[in-house]
Amino acid sequence: MDNLKYLNHIQLYFDDEKEIPDLPIQILQKMPNLTKMTISECSCLEVFQTQIPEIVEKRVLTHLKILKLDNVSKLQSIGSEDSPWLNVICDSEKLQQLYVINCPDLKTLVHSTPSVTFTYVKEMYIDNCNELTYLFTLSSVNKLENLEHIEVTDCESMEAIVLKEEDDISEEIKLQKLKRVELNDLSSLECFYSGNDTLRLPSLMQVDIWICPKMEFFSRGDIYLNSSFKGIQASNVSSDDLVFHHDLNSSVQKVFLQQVTTFNSESIN
């Protein structure tokens, strides 16, 4: 057990979805250098269910830098009262990378009355979560003060990365540190932001758009970038030239037309 103090990555894998896992908190307390945790093939997030009060009170998992949730089949959102131990991790100032992969029941990344803000998260990777229609609402996106990289792949219902709901009060969106946005194989995606409020992205360097056949614009409002923005990567070949035409919305429109032309020519052939 003494060797656990050297462990920096733990992967919890459950091959029986009917099994209700329960990992003793005493084991976690013997892992002071644990920085990465992966939970795979798990039907629910009751991994530490019997010891939730201790985990929340002692903040046992707040030193994690990387959290990966892979095929947690009943996960519907993050930030609800059903998984307070997960909320403690996601709101920790140490957490830098969040991966959410193959979660078929995930309907919203952030719960409607969230207990977490992801304020300290720098990188977010979402892959193959087919019930997701958006990642953030207007009311939650400005809390992502340290977010540098978003990658969303193969989420067939995704319509917007940031959604403006009917009762949202208009406000300027500022993602001060966001450097890169990667949007891959999103068949329903129409835009990054669905509203018309001003969008400020002073650190943005590159946007990747690949197989997003419905994406005709980035945002309907004004978009302010700095000279650091290089353009849009519109293919899966990193050495290809970036697309830039006047501004970000015009560049997205150009990529849209290019991909429509490519799709039509491939259909004919």
Role assignments for model-derived ranges:
Residues 1-269:
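Cross-kingdom leucine-rich repeat
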